[in-house]
């Protein structure tokens, strides 16, 4: 089934070219189906890139989904025009009285800052608090996962000695959980971050379960005991060349950055990377949307129970 987005959203052209099923608003309006309402709080600088990456995965499921793109009012975006945000995004104030089946909080390239020094931290805290009563299941990605773990459970992040950068092997640690249903025994995920959360800190919180981890990249997938909050420390949504683009960007700035691990064939940046994470990414998002959103959310969203009960 398709995703429903604004008819003139630029990401739609890219998704259509990849044969991702996009439904125009006027067609979706005439279908007697309640689509899942999914909000995406896009904290990344270049909005359209993240839109395409996430909508590609969401659009590959068998569900009709209505997307609401959100941006923060308290942060001035330097890489996306105000006109673009006005046309395709809404603010928290505009949607705070609505309820959603799901919410995605993306990463942001600010992980070396203390949370309190992030200029939009107060607004983000308001959104995470609001999500307890207005969102059935929230998927937090990379820095968004670290922010969520810190806000909801007081779990800190730690600065790494060097950037964790590359594509790393992971293993499932809780095979019976629905979120990892169908996962291979070993699977790969891209990571690009300067900070981490530690396993021992997560294990101290009885409401949380670690579902997957990596010897090199550490804790990867964390689930709360009600399935209402999911934390993903990597970037399974990344495009084939995202890590290359980040690497070349940092090299051009003169930064002392190592080549992404397990990414370029023979560690040759002139060779095309082999994608090892696409199937896992599709399965992660489809499992979340099916088992933790579609199967659990009441048909009438006004009947949604708060996550703290």
UniProtKB/Swiss-Prot annotation:
Entry EC number(s): 2.3.1.31
Catalytic residues of the enzyme: 142 (acyl-thioester intermediate), 235 (proton acceptor), 237
Important for substrate specificity (site feature) positions: 192
One of the GO biological process terms: L-methionine biosynthetic process from homoserine via O-succinyl-L-homoserine and cystathionine
Database matches in Pfam families: HTS
Gene Ontology molecular functions: homoserine O-acetyltransferase activity; homoserine O-succinyltransferase activity
Superkingdom of the source species: Bacteria
Site note Important for acyl-CoA specificity, residues: 111
Record keywords, A-Z: Acyltransferase, Amino-acid biosynthesis, Cytoplasm, Methionine biosynthesis, Transferase
InterPro entries, sorted: Class_I_gatase-like, HST_MetA, MetA_family
GO terms for cellular component: cytoplasm
UniProt record similarity statement: Belongs to the MetA family.
Protein name, UniProt field: Homoserine O-acetyltransferase
Phylogenetic placement of the source organism: Bacteria, Bacillati, Bacillota, Clostridia, Eubacteriales
Gene (name only): metAA
